[in-house]
Regions:
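GH16 jelly-roll
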Residues: 2-284
């Protein structure tokens, strides 16, 4: 991995009626996007992530996102069954997420320890991935993220074959963007990680652009047109899906209880996403 930072020539890519993208040098074409126009979430593009690692995750709901009619998806915390919850959106599915339903393999009382598989809505390999968003103002109660993940991460020891998790943006603390990660090997004994970059003192009151260029050389990360590091390990050659995440803190701790700060900001904080776009390079 290369911890390089600096301004590089970025190319403006205009999208009619919306904020422009800023892309690395070269020629690009947009191959997928959601501008969040209208007032209803496009369910042909997004589904709600409700389960994780074979269990229904208590932090998530399918009611925590609304479109504001101004081309934004607005994430917020709400109270559900006495618990503060929020939403994650995804364009595909991890094969280990769904809860296991008891069945049999033929006449044998045996089965794989995975739930029902789902067909992905959208996956992609290589290209440039960009999100423009305004971060939550009170991250002491919840966190936000923009990332991609392989549907079959960890199904083999070869990241080229079964993919990685790529964390383009994660915000756990005020003004801080965590280092960008490439995880491989799944989420157990074989898990490995490379990390690079990250910033402090980011202005939380304005929109920012977070991007990643993924190609045969690895992953290059960008914040507001400034390169924030390159990872040349664990290079995936498998199509992956996109996630926009929020999550109340505490549910992943040993007692699986939300932090008290989450209760204090119910209905008082928002994570706002202007757009998500995917670009492919145009071959000369």
């Amino acid at each position: 991995m290369i911890d390089r930072k600096g301004f590089y020539e970025m190319k403006e890519y205009r999208v009619g009626g919306h904020e422009a993208s800023f892309l690395p040098d070269g020629n690009w074409k947009m191959v997928w996007s959601d501008e969040f126009d209208g007032t209803e979430l496009d369910r042909t593009k997004w589904d709600y992530r409700l389960s994780m690692m074979g269990k229904r995750h208590p932090a998530w709901t399918d009611k925590g996102v609304r479109l504001d009619g101004k081309s934004n998806a607005v994430f917020s915390i709400l109270l559900e069954d006495g618990r503060p919850v929020s939403s994650q959106l995804q364009t595909g599915y991890n094969f280990m997420d769904e809860p296991v339903v008891a069945t049999k393999f033929g006449h044998d009382a045996l089965q794989w320890n995975i739930g029902k598989l789902k067909k992905d809505l959208y996956t992609h390999k290589f290209g440039y991935y960009e999100c423009r968003c305004k971060l939550q103002q009170k991250p002491e109660g919840w966190w936000s993220a923009f990332w991609v993940q392989s549907p079959i991460i960890g199904a083999s020891l070869d990241p080229a074959e079964t993919g990685t998790e790529l964390d383009i943006m994660e915000c756990f603390h005020h003004g801080v963007i965590a280092g960008h990660n490439a995880f491989t090997g799944g989420y157990g004994l074989d898990s490995k990680r490379a990390s690079v970059g990250g910033v402090k003192d980011l202005d939380m009151t304005v929109f920012h652009r977070f991007g990643m260029k993924w190609d045969e050389t690895g992953y290059t990360f960008y914040i507001d047109g400034k390169e924030d590091g390159h990872i040349d390990q664990y290079i995936s050659r498998h199509p992956e899906f996109i996630l926009i995440s929020t999550e109340v803190k505490g549910y992943r701790y040993e007692d699986h209880q939300p932090v008290k700060e989450a209760f204090e900001i119910i209905g008082k904080d928002e994570f706002i996403v202007d757009y998500v776009r995917v670009f492919d390079p145009v071959k000369e």
